[in-house]
Amino acid sequence: MRSIANKKLVIATHNIGKLQEITTLVAPFGLTIQSAKELGLPEPKETGTTFEENAYIKAFAAAKNTGLPALSDDSGLEVDALNGAPGVYTADLALQSDGTRDFLKAMQKIEEKLQKIGAHKKSQRKCRFISVICIAWPDAHADYFHGRVEGSFIWPPRGDKGFGFDPVFLPDGYKNTFGEMTTEQKHGWKLNDQTPLSHRACAFKLLAENLLKLS
């Protein structure tokens, strides 16, 4: 498994919320980072059918265009009662005709589907967030790191922190949704300290221990 020798890394995302979270996680490692948006890179079409495929598409596109290693996160929400949907298509569920994303409408769509099948109890609303982090190099080499967190889909949404589906995700064993947690509480992890909570922090801990050669 490679290391990031030159300490330069491109974050392959145009999602402001995701960029902020990744930047927070990367901060302790002394890397010089730039985002795909800052560099004016186009957003590649996510044509993959798995989190791994879409993470690679984004990371390799940025690496190829910059000549630097690039990190991408592809993540989504899997709801058991909906046979794992929306899954890899989570972000697409929020996509509007004008190209913007409305996550409140997306959350409402999931709630309507759960209501339609009679999934009213918390025990019927089990779900999880999945994160796959890919770091790709210009020569097409890639490393992957996986994370997940179990919880329940709650309604109505609670909290105005975080982004995406955070307000409707209640992690197992907690009273607050991700939307009610600070970034630090949501991640639940710092270098050499604590066990990670969020799916993204779980994946990043593996990245830190293996690719960044830290523990």
Swiss-Prot record:
GO BP field: nucleotide metabolic process; purine nucleoside triphosphate catabolic process
GO molecular function, one term: metal ion binding
Keywords, in A-Z order: Hydrolase, Magnesium, Metal-binding, Nucleotide metabolism, Nucleotide-binding
Keyword Oxidoreductase: no
Catalyzed reactions: XTP + H2O = XMP + diphosphate + H(+); dITP + H2O = dIMP + diphosphate + H(+); ITP + H2O = IMP + diphosphate + H(+)
Cofactor(s) recorded in Swiss-Prot or TrEMBL: Mg(2+)
Coiled coil: none
Co-factor binding details: Binds 1 Mg(2+) ion per subunit.
Protein name: dITP/XTP pyrophosphatase
Naturally occurring in which organism (per UniProt): Bartonella henselae (strain ATCC 49882 / DSM 28221 / CCUG 30454 / Houston 1)
